[in-house]
């Protein structure tokens, strides 16, 4: 999803998960993608009648563990520019400097593994 537009992700993820839930009837759904979670998690939670867990940048545990109070977030371009990441930083790392680096190459690297 790192190379898709936000509009594509916002439309595709809830629709896709809705179809999967109808087909498989799970007890819980996990969005195991930072980009999809930071863009579509709220919409998916509103649309589905089951718990939905998202995977988002681990800013909270990083802030708890940091001694330098400087946190680096490496993600896709779409992930690092999301307001969701702004809120995580404000809520859990307001006393830290949160450096963000977005890279389209992460998608290629992950898919090459």
What are the language-model segments listed below?
Residues 1-113:
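Non-catalytic structural scaffold of enzyme domains
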């Amino acid at each position: 999803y790192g190379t898709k537009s936000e509009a594509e992700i916002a439309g595709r993820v809830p629709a896709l998960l809705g179809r999967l839930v109808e087909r498989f009837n799970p007890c819980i759904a996990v969005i195991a993608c930072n980009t999809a979670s930071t863009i579509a998690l709220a919409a998916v939670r509103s649309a589905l009648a089951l718990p939905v867990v998202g995977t988002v940048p681990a800013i909270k545990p990083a802030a708890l563990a940091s001694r330098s109070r400087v946190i680096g977030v490496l993600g896709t371009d779409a992930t690092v520019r999301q307001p969701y990441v702004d809120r995580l930083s404000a809520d859990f790392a307001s006393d830290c400097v949160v450096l963000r680096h977005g890279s389209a190459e992460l998608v290629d690297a992950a898919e090459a593994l």
